[in-house]
Amino acid sequence: MPAYDGWYARNMYDVNSHVYKHHVETYGPVTEFGFKDFIPMFKAEKFDPQAWARLFKEAGARYVVPVAEHHDGFALYNSTFNPWNSVKIGPKRDIVKELRAAILAEGLHFGLSSHRAENCWFFSEGMKIPSDVQDTTITLYGERIQEPDGPTLSREVVHQDGSNEHSRRDWLTHMYEIIDQYQPELLYFDWTVGKEPFQETFYKFMAYYYNNAIDWNKGVVVNTKFGYGDNIQVFDIERGKSDQIRPYPWQTDTSIGKVFWFHHKDESDLKSVNHLIDDLVDIVSKNGNLLLNVGPRADGTIPESQQKVLREIGHWLQVNGEAIYETRPWIKSGEGPNKGTAGYMTDSEQSVYTSKDIRFTTRKDILYATVLSWTDGFVTIESLSEDVKPVHSVSMLGCDEQ
């Protein structure tokens, strides 16, 4: 709702954060106006799931993964176990159900993202100061987990110690619920589920999900960031890429914004179309997929600036999608002086490529070479040496000449 900061719900309770200052100046003290008070203002009155699905298809997407619930604990679906949901409060609509129907109607694959596991600590900053978070009857704010000696549990400590038993049981109940209600083909998770204390619970979830998928006669995917082998889930790199071809399929999840995930009033930091296409090509050349985030407004519309970027990506894929969809890695991902950035949280700035930077993909006996910058009319592919199979013909996608 505030359209000011991605982790507004947490940082509005941190007295050392600029978000706290902004909140107090704009909405008043956190004792009187807490995060819960934004929810009735969230109406999604212009939300059109069919328009969203058409846009995503036009952008060239093959699968769509709405957020069922983020760290803040507000569910965008009809939950029996969480009264803080979009059917009972705010929009009075089952956002997930409506999107699922629209996405499937466009012939796209439907997944869900859940961050319920992070809710147990997300509002713990509010326990340090007088705030509505200290009212433990407000279940939206989760466990407010604290360290044994009193200080509020930080994100870094959560990385070390995980959650608690009650929050893990709570998480599992919610996962069973969205599996049963929506039958997603993909479930994406953030980092807490990868911590050792969470893993026993997560294995129970995976067994339930995979066994149900057999009954549905569907192939399903689980995305995690660490803690589990590539043979049981699909590895995900947040806002980053791999530096090599990975033997198993993997995924980059990133945002259309250089910094934001959620809607921000200042959209000057949108990534360029070229930036996103370069990343897509590099990711696919290394056996990966791209999950691209957009930040809608509270009224349910996707800003026109973001729509424009998506449509331009779609236009490029209409011509060049043959080198992307249903392809496999070649014997090497590419060549050229710029190997690109690798690792988590490394993609905010665009890599500077030259016409010597090329990425490879294959389909059957066809090798696709995508040049990451405009050339002077000539391209030299050094990887096609005499040791490689002979080249029978060369053509450019979108051009009938050879």
Describe each region flagged by the PLM.
Residues 1-402:
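Mature catalytic domains of secreted/periplasmic carbohydrate-active enzymes
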